[in-house]
Amino acid sequence: MTLLEKTRKINAMLQNAAGKTVNFKEMADTLTDVIEANTYIVSRKGKLLGYSEALPIENDRMKQMLTERQFPEEYTQSLFNVGETSSNLEVSSQYTAFPIENSDLFTKGLTTIVPIVGGGERLGTLILSRLESNFTDDDLLLAEYGGTVVGMEILHEKAEEIEEEARSRAVVQMAISSLSYSELEAIEHIFDELNGKEGLLVASKIADRVGITRSVIVNALRKLESAGVIDSRSLGMKGTFIRVLNDKFLVELEKLKNN
């Protein structure tokens, strides 16, 4: 492939990702294909978002890292010291992508570190490694362009997460605001009783202890269930099984209690 063809292939990653869930594995595959190197996309916290290996590394520790999809904290933190692309780092470098315990097997191994930056912040790191042949200027151009594309997708994913979180919080707030004072009081007692995200509730016992009618509890649960905040299932004489579906519910409920 020519440099132009390789650039177009990376550009296609961005076009194909539009409106879809980000697939960092496919991105890593593309970068491995055009740069001809092992590719690891690592988040700022060391999570392995995606990887592709042109030459699999036969090392138990490396295999475990790939299986667990997590890079060591010390190594991840050290990557923040790399503020710009660092190319052709030898096995003796602290940033090498090759296992140091087997350095004698990879004496000619080379690593390139590309910081992934977006929105003025460090989002992660693109790590490339290969045996013997140096990373050329063309390789580095492709790597930095690839890092930019990956950064844009990380930002897009973060924006979607923030949007989803805001939507979940809004649903919870609307559901809680629909409750009457007595229904809200009932809900607070119910989840004090459950002491978690799910559990068995006997409405009559809570009604008697708190001094409210059973119908208040039933109405409160129905409102939350219709809003998609909880799921409830009657178990007959045993009571009602309740499970929280929206993670923001307990947080907002705790805020209300503290206020």
Swiss-Prot record:
<keyword id="KW-0678">Repressor</keyword>
<dbReference type="InterPro" id="IPR036388">
    <property type="entry name" value="WH-like_DNA-bd_sf"/>
</dbReference>
<dbReference type="Pfam" id="PF08222">
    <property type="entry name" value="HTH_CodY"/>
</dbReference>
<keyword id="KW-0963">Cytoplasm</keyword>
<dbReference type="GO" id="GO:0005737">
    <property type="term" value="C:cytoplasm"/>
</dbReference>
<dbReference type="InterPro" id="IPR014154">
    <property type="entry name" value="CodY"/>
</dbReference>
<protein>
    <recommendedName>
        <fullName>Global transcriptional regulator CodY</fullName>
    </recommendedName>
</protein>
<dbReference type="GO" id="GO:0045892">
    <property type="term" value="P:negative regulation of DNA-templated transcription"/>
</dbReference>
<dbReference type="GO" id="GO:0003677">
    <property type="term" value="F:DNA binding"/>
</dbReference>
<dbReference type="GO" id="GO:0003700">
    <property type="term" value="F:DNA-binding transcription factor activity"/>
</dbReference>
<keyword id="KW-0238">DNA-binding</keyword>
<dbReference type="InterPro" id="IPR010312">
    <property type="entry name" value="Transc_reg_CodY_N"/>
</dbReference>
<feature type="DNA-binding region" description="H-T-H motif">
    <location>
        <begin position="203"/>
        <end position="222"/>
    </location>
</feature>
<feature type="region of interest" description="GAF domain">
    <location>
        <begin position="1"/>
        <end position="155"/>
    </location>
</feature>
<dbReference type="InterPro" id="IPR013198">
    <property type="entry name" value="GTP_trans_reg_CodY_C"/>
</dbReference>
<dbReference type="InterPro" id="IPR029016">
    <property type="entry name" value="GAF-like_dom_sf"/>
</dbReference>
<keyword id="KW-0804">Transcription</keyword>
<comment type="similarity">
    <text>Belongs to the CodY family.</text>
</comment>
<dbReference type="Pfam" id="PF06018">
    <property type="entry name" value="CodY"/>
</dbReference>
<dbReference type="InterPro" id="IPR036390">
    <property type="entry name" value="WH_DNA-bd_sf"/>
</dbReference>
<comment type="function">
    <text>DNA-binding global transcriptional regulator which is involved in the adaptive response to starvation and acts by directly or indirectly controlling the expression of numerous genes in response to nutrient availability. During rapid exponential growth, CodY is highly active and represses genes whose products allow adaptation to nutrient depletion.</text>
</comment>
<dbReference type="GO" id="GO:0005525">
    <property type="term" value="F:GTP binding"/>
</dbReference>
<keyword id="KW-0805">Transcription regulation</keyword>
